[in-house]
Regions:
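Short, flexible helix-loop junctions that flank or precede catalytic/ligand sites
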Residues: 2-5, 10-14, 18, 28-415
Length: 415
């Protein structure tokens, strides 16, 4: 059980209260956050450690509650710590409440000087956080984002999986697994897509782990931040964190070409420069994996093309058609037992798909996926039906999570 919050926080509350009392009453809003950032280092080392230990205890609670995310601070939290447990955001009512200033100090105490300056200048900070989970005697990593909520400081921390799921457990068609294998295809682009929290990183890590166990390659991972840290096995794996080891995704991709890679993993194709660099690097005989915040294969193709300047779109469309290998789009759907299961759409690029991309007929691709089961493809609706027939998800969830509501109802009613 998690320790009683009334006994674990008495010292921390005193530390927080005494610090907050030093904040001049004449300053308001973001200036209060700046004051906290400028003066947090004046805390005694023991006080800093006590506040960090409180965060670690809250993270332990998060792990043991099977939560994926924790939220600390910000006006919207109303003093509570919130967690996302099996997909649902919930107040944790038996943890202590904090004022906005107290929460800001708890958050800022996690940062070094460079991170504080980045937060204050950019109004946002992506970072990773690691602590030692005593019960399992392992280091646990979190992806974190600090941001402002109506001039108050807030933070989300997302648990990075303690272990990597075997690629076989994700139930891809053997031909889909073959498409991501460096041993089978030496160069080209594979996209893993989905909304935030859909498990993209889990799938990407499973693919990396598969290479690390069975498919030797030199893999360079460029991410912001680095999440799961892979230990080299049959593959040599390097991790480059944006803002820490390299200045940008584009720089990381360009520099990787001088580092003798076989596979380059780009954490996210979030801007035109990164998209162009990722497409061009496949010209040099490398395999690229990356992610997008899109819900379907066709939406992913349209998004990439729309991200670049209109004068470049025709060239990018042709380049994408030439280098794209596969697109995996996924969602996490509530299960009947209160957990979540991955539903997926898989596009394998065939000559017909390639022609549709080049001719700007991406609307035709859905039916190609629908009819491409023998080639390893599956639509989101087909996979949702399969999960429903396996009695893993409800009918309501199958319809709710479908990209094409009309199509899901048609295939669910078919004999």
């Amino acid at each position: 059980m998690f320790e009683n919050p009334d006994t674990i926080t008495i010292d921390e509350k005193i530390i927080l209260r005494e610090f907050v009392e030093t904040i001049p009453t004449s300053i308001f809003g973001p200036d209060r956050v700046r004051y906290i950032a400028d003066n947090a280092d004046k805390l005694a080392e023991g006080d800093k450690l006590a506040l960090r230990n409180f965060v670690n205890k809250a993270l332990t609670r998060m792990i043991e509650s099977e939560a994926s995310d924790i939220e600390i601070g910000g006006r919207g939290n109303e003093g509570y710590i919130w967690m996302r447990i099996h997909g649902n955001k919930e107040r944790v009512r038996d943890l202590p409440q904090f004022t906005e200033d107290e929460s800001a100090l708890i958050i800022i105490n996690l940062f070094n000087d460079n991170q504080k300056q980045h937060l204050l200048s950019k109004r946002n900070l992506d970072f990773s956080y690691t602590y030692f989970y005593e019960k399992r005697k392992i280091n646990v990593r979190f992806r974190a984002d600090a941001y402002f909520d109506l001039d108050t400081l807030a933070m989300n921390m997302r648990l990075i999986n303690l272990s990597v799921r075997p690629l076989s457990s994700l139930e891809f068609h053997p031909l889909a697994v073959r498409s991501v294998s460096h041993n089978y295809i030496k160069f080209g682009l594979t996209l893993i897509t989905g909304i935030t929290g859909s498990g993209k990183s889990t799938t990407l890590d499973s693919i990396i782990d598969h290479h690390n166990k069975f498919d030797p390659a030199h893999i360079i991972i460029i991410a912001a931040p680095i999440e799961y840290v892979h230990t080299s096995n049959v593959s040599l794996i390097k991790h480059r964190e944006v803002g820490r080891d390299v200045l940008s995704f584009k720089d990381g991709i360009v520099q990787a070409l001088r580092q003798d890679p076989d596979i380059i993993v780009v954490g996210e194709m979030r801007d035109p420069d990164t998209i162009m660099a990722a497409l061009e690097v496949t010209d040099t005989g490398h395999k690229v994996f990356s992610t997008l915040h899109t819900s379907s294969a066709t939406e992913s193709l349209d998004r990439i093309i729309a991200e670049v300047h209109p004068s470049e779109q025709e060239r990018v469309r042709n380049r994408l058609a030439d280098v794209l290998i596969s697109v995996i789009s996924q969602k996490l759907v509530p299960t009947l037992d209160g957990k979540r299961v991955m539903a997926k759409e898989v596009l394998i690029v065939t000559p017909s798909v390639r022609a549709a991309i080049k001719n700007n007929n991406t609307s035709e691709i859905y039916m190609m996926i629908n009819q491409g089961g023998a080639q390893g493809m599956i639509t989101m609706e087909q996979d949702l039906k399969k999960l429903y027939m396996q009695k893993k998800i409800s009918l309501e969830s199958a319809i709710t999570y479908a990209n094409n509501k009309t199509r899901i109802q048609q295939i669910l009613s078919a004999k």
